[in-house]
């Protein structure tokens, strides 16, 4: 069995060091990273080992679909539920043992996230990934092309009430990400 992991270059070395600790318990082998390029194919953000395109297009489509990307500036800042990873099948609450499972389970079964991923727009300076806009954490952002007003779109983690106080316009997500973030009781 083989798995391909796409990770930002600035996180690759730390990820390799971390995952190698678990290699002692399995027949895992890490291979050297290969260059991979972000592309948009049929309106879907994906990756290619051959085609190199404008990364801005990939970022804009990714943000519109609620697909965030983690970089060194944002690693370790967010919990999986805050990024809606459970709505994408990225967290399995019934699976056996994995690193961080007790924290994930505690949040899922005993509490609900207080802040979670939203797609927003605003006119103003483009915030950087990992930056705070008052009580709102920026995951990713991109300047809107062909916009004379200087607006941007961003994925942010925030409490819904905090979004209104900053004046951000909340935009929609695809239907898969419009489900309640908390566990149904």
Identify the role of each PLM range.
Residues 101-102:
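Structural motif
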Residues 61, 67-69, 73, 83-90, ...:
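Glycine-rich, small/acidic residue-mixed loop/short-helix segments
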Residues 1-68:
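Acidic, low-complexity central loop/insert segments
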């Amino acid at each position: 069995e083989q798995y391909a992991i796409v990770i930002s270059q600035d996180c690759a070395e730390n990820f390799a060091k971390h995952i190698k600790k678990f290699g002692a318990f399995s027949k895992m082998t890490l291979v050297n990273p290969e260059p991979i390029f972000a592309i948009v194919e049929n309106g879907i953000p994906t990756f290619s080992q051959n085609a190199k395109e404008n990364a801005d297009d990939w970022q804009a489509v990714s943000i519109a679909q609620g697909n965030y990307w983690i970089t060194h500036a944002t690693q370790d800042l967010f919990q999986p539920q805050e990024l809606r990873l459970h709505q994408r099948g990225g967290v399995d609450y019934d699976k056996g043992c994995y690193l961080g499972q007790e924290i994930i389970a505690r949040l899922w079964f005993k509490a609900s996230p207080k802040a979670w991923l939203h797609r927003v727009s605003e006119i103003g300076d483009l915030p950087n990934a990992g930056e705070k806009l008052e009580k709102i954490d920026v995951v990713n952002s991109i300047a809107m092309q062909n916009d004379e007003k200087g607006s941007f779109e961003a994925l942010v983690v925030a409490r819904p009430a905090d979004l209104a106080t900053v004046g951000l316009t909340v935009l929609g997500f695809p239907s898969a990400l419009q489900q309640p973030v908390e566990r149904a009781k």
